[in-house]
Amino acid sequence: VPMPMSVEARTPVVVGVGDVTHRGDDFVDPIDLAVEAARRAVKDAGRAVERRIDTVATPGILVIPRDNPASRIAEAMRISPARRISCPVGGNTPQYLVEVLGGEIGEGRADVVLVVGAESGHSARKLQGRALLDSPPPPRSSDESLGDARPGLSQAELSVGLSWPHEVYPIFESAIAARHGRDFDAQREWLGTLMAPFTAEAARHPQQAWFPRSRSATELSEVTAENRMVCLPYPKLLNSIMSVDMAAAFILMAAEVADELGVARDRWVFPWSAATCNDVYFPVERPDLSRSSGIEVAARKALNAGRLTIDDIRWFDLYSCFPSAIEMAAEALDLDPLDDRGLTVTGGLPYHGGPGNNYVSHSIVEMVRRCRRDPTDVGLVTGLGWYSTKHSVGLWSATPPPTGWRLLDTAVEQAQIDSSRLGVAGVDEATGCATVDGYTVVYDRDGQPRWTPIIAHLYDGRRVVARSDDPQIAEAMGAEMYVGKTVCLRDTGSFTGFELP
């Protein structure tokens, strides 16, 4: 069939998708998992595409890290792509790669791109720190790096011991709760309602989802021995789970190459538009801990490019590492968080499973399958990196993009966002009173409150990060909402502490 006029020759199109969820008792190497997902994507597109792959791009593997993963995957597949790319930390990576490498396809610098990633978090957990099998020999070639490699936290957050996403996202949640006039208990109840539909979606994917079980709002929000409090207001079932053995892959190529290779038209799904924008990079510097301007910019640009509004979108997969990420995305999109279209096509990171930087590859794989089934509909995928820091958004449809493939520049908006960042007081200047902007209480595995990190501002507007290790303060701040209240800072010598007045 000759190409219809509506598809320009260099339009990027996804023609093959594959995923693997490995449930055995054995240990699997992430490279082996990735290769299996890639083979499935090749089979989905038709064997002819394999020898034409000129670029392999791999989101960074976190739990059992492998150096030069793209080169290792290519060698295991016995293909020799000209470019092998691996990426730094960022859950937005797969959608970001669609944008950047789709751009290269559009400009004729790449023809056939394999994006593939994996995590063996479940294997790692079973190994409990023992080395996985044998360390593989080094690959014959090395990867180039693509993406923003800055760390996710500044010295201000690190100085009080904040380091993990599960400690930082609840701080955003407290700011969201306070803005809606809720305390932690009321917020936790609401989050059960928000997340229950995600579990129902996961249950519809028994082959893929790590936890394919539908749960009620109460099951999710009620604190029990099985559902222990992790960091207020998130019990365990509201947290992303990375200890999964999963891989996903998709093949992106120029439309003219897909035609030349005879890829059946019913395989074709187009990225319509793609945009990336960061929030103010470090959480401590963000003027509003309860909102994301980066998602708002990226999503608005992507929708405008497709000449669509949010009402035109049939499916969403909003990045769901923690509930606050979903709430911020829904608000940025002007979307009711309980919209009956649903906010996920997979079940999300807590229930489908959150395989590190590669989760969005699973979103894209499932979105492609839906677009193939309903070719006139459009889906929207968001990906997010670090602490609601880096945002990549894309539109997807089996209908060719009516405006052509659109790469979107967000430089002007990015400069505006960056210029809104707040100053941060040095440790020696963090004295006197401060007003709490966001906080959480971190619990231990026995259900006892352990410590309380806060992000607050001084009378002059500069931000501070402080912590208390007093269990009574933790108890008090868990019982009542402290966002907007005053605390007294004190220098502990090594970090900024605080007390209640």
Describe the predicted segments one by one.
Residues 2-88, 102-110, 114-250, 254-257, ...:
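Conserved "HGTGT" condensation-loop signature of ketosynthase/thiolase-family condensing enzymes
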Residues 95-103:
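Conserved phosphate-binding catalytic cores of ATP/NTP-utilizing and phosphoryl-transfer enzymes
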Residues 352-360, 371, 376:
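A conserved active-site cap/scaffold subdomain adjacent to cofactor or substrate pockets
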